[in-house]
Amino acid sequence: MTALNAVEKGAAAVGAHLVRDVSLPALVLHREALEHNIRWMQDFVSNSGAELAPHGKTSMMPALFQRQIEAGAWGITLANAVQTRAAYAGGVRRVLMANQLVGAPNMALIADLLADKDFDFHCMVDHPDNVADLGLFFAARGLRLNVMIEYGVVGGRCGCRSEQEVRELAKAIKAQPALALTGIEGYEGVIHGEHAISGIRDFAASLVRLAVDLQNNGSFDLPKPIITASGSAWYDLIAESFEEQNAAGRFLSVLRPGSYVAHDHGIYKEAQCCVLDRRSDLNEGLRPALEVWAHVQSMPEPGFAVIALGKRDVAYDAGLPVPLKRYRAGIVPAEGDDVTACIVTAVMDQHAFMTVAPGVELRIGDIISFGTSHPCLTFDKWQVGCLVDEQLQVIESLHTCF
């Protein structure tokens, strides 16, 4: 008997059709919406006088990184040394690592990349101990590491908690010949509550104020230091605040949203609606490009269907999958029927429980397309996704590097 190789979940050959040829479940990206989102965010950031370094942790698809860079992105944001190595292998040559570089093995991964003089890398620091460790490690290798001070908020995530801590850390960096202070960074996504909008504006203004203070004190090692913030929900407020503070006049302003590339049918759809409410000049927003497709597996009771889709396939931390359309398996051209009135009520490891709306007729083997909420935690469940055209034909396989 001929040996058979393992098959990767959701893998498909170029030219395959989603409803006829692809083993499901599958991660699906719609080309038209994806390209729209890449253009939309690049235009928004450029028109705001800033640069874009999209957070690659969302998809960890180097092929998407290249599309974003070709559209004008300044660089790619990443979360750790392993992600940085994957992006470098995929052709990325400028990285903001929006995290602290901790641990000698992780430092070694970055040191290897810094042997390439064309590789521009910046990581965050928020504590003198980390500064000392980095200074010692990179000095021993004859390398100089670009670091940025992270400024945070009380009760938030990482980052110095006071302006005085920032100033003291800048002095500690100055004392390390192997380190270069290239900017200041913050993350506003941890600011919540009734006064979140004003709190985010104040936080962005404080970043600029601190950057000006450090620049006036000669702390930076770049003539035009970097100032950066912005996740995927409040990027408009950060852009607006940086503009109001004239940050672009003295600094390289960099925004770092990531989820926009795929968007979603959940939390980022809601966040985008808020952006459009705040910005009446934006007459069109982002489009959901990401779906997960799966078969109806069982219909053991009236009005109840079990879908061959579970926690191994789709995010469930910020809302359950949203049924979108029903397709008859094998029928091409595929005309999907609206099933948005159906509701997923629970997910298990490999199963989703779906209440079937009155008037919706399903049969075993039917294909349901699902929207998701929080794309970062859907992408990481896949090693390959299907990029499809408007006819639902696979035009490219996109590989992840988680």
Locations of regions flagged by a protein language model:
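Conserved, mostly hydrophobic/aromatic
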Residues: 34, 57, 87, 149, ...
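Active-site loop/helix belt of alpha/beta enzymes
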Residues: 152-280
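Internal helical hairpin/lid segments
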Residues: 259-331
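Active-site-proximal beta-alpha core segment in soluble small-molecule metabolic enzymes
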Residues: 55-194
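C-terminal accessory subdomain/extension
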Residues: 301-402
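A charged N-terminal "starter" segment
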Residues: 1-112, 387, 398-402
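Glycine-rich tight-turn/loop motif centered on a GG-T
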Residues: 19-30, 93-97, 111-122, 194-201, ...
